[in-house]
Amino acid sequence: MVTIGFNRDNNNALPTSIRFDGTAIIRGQGIHAFGAGCMVSIEKNAVLDVGNNFGCTGDTRISVKKSLVIGCDNLWSYGCVIMDNDGHYIFDENHQIINEPQGIMFGDKVWMGCNCIVLKNVTIPSYSIIAAGSKITKKLHGQNSIFTTKGIVLKNKVYWKA
């Protein structure tokens, strides 16, 4: 089941926008939920691949121009920004694009706190926790870890339950 714009009330409705010009793959029979105020944009020739039991609460922004793979059992808090691109292309003196989109991959069972930013060419390993307010700009290493800004490991050998 896919739920879009949940937790809305008539007095405080946040607009929710989902645009699929590319390919969206929703795997499994579990819950796939995008909260109120989420904005999801999948550009032409891009792929969003969402594993079983995914949930993100309100006001999250997802922009995919190449690929975003989300493993199973991911839970994201509100106010997150996930972008596999820079929003606009930058060209060199030969008119060649110098900032191509680069894919993002979330492993299985990733919990991301509120107001996180995940940018292009990032891999987040399975069984990770991303601390609230973190900005992730590189591939992370290690499972069962809490990561904070710049991919710094805050603690190892941890796990979470919803």
Task: Give the ranges of each region predicted by the language model.
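Flexible, glycine/small-residue-enriched loop-and-beta-strand segment within the central core
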Residues: 1-123, 139-141, 150-152, 157-159
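Tight coil/turn sites that cap or link beta-strands
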Residues: 45, 127, 133, 142-144
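Short, hydrophobic/aromatic alpha-helical segments in well-folded domains
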Residues: 114, 131-132
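Long, ordered, amphipathic alpha-helical scaffolds
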Residues: 134-135, 162
